[in-house]
Amino acid sequence: MLEAFGLGTLAQSSLLLAGLLVCWVTVPRRLIGILAGFGAGALIAAVSFDLLGEAEGLGSWELALWMLIGVAVFLGGDFVVERRFGSEGAGGAMGIVVGSVVDGVPESIIFGIQIATDFPVSISFVAAVFVSNIPQAMAPSADLAASGWSVRRLGTLWLLVVLACGVAAALGYLAADASSSANGDRMAALAAGGLLAMLTNSLMPFAYDRGGALAGAATVVGFCLSVLGT
């Protein structure tokens, strides 16, 4: 269980590191957009080749159902964020944070299940998650800091996200250890659906708004490098 918790927190720890980096290092707005585009490409590759590959045991209808559940979870969280913070500025940035949770928690549950069932954990997938989290955290943190969030508040936000992912990995391990039929298929499909919704509604518009046309090129580069690493 501790191994699962450690892997879950390690894979998502770049959220905390990148989220705090923008508080001490001035990152140009355009560069943040390009990095966000790069992260979007890496995440598209993760959905296409890792998450959907993990969910291959599901039938087509069940796969679609769990992906739609992931979409519903993201949209529900995004709705709460808009009501609390508004749709622009901090609200738009918090939408990406919600997407990080919707994406990271199911991913971490999958890690826990894989460890408990002695299923080989894909190092390339863990690396893709770690790397793609960097612009995914850097982009909204820059906006949140600009809207008045303190370093402590930002650090607490991302630390809670990372710890939630670690706990999710431990719970995935315990669930798999208690049930011989447990697998990560449904969690992978849920994460894929929520992630695609977040990319479309939050991260990719965010990338284009700040990075302009180069965000599209960065997306392709991020996708290609992730594919080459699988």
Descriptions of predicted regions:
Residues 1-230:
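Intrinsically disordered, metal-sensing/regulatory segments
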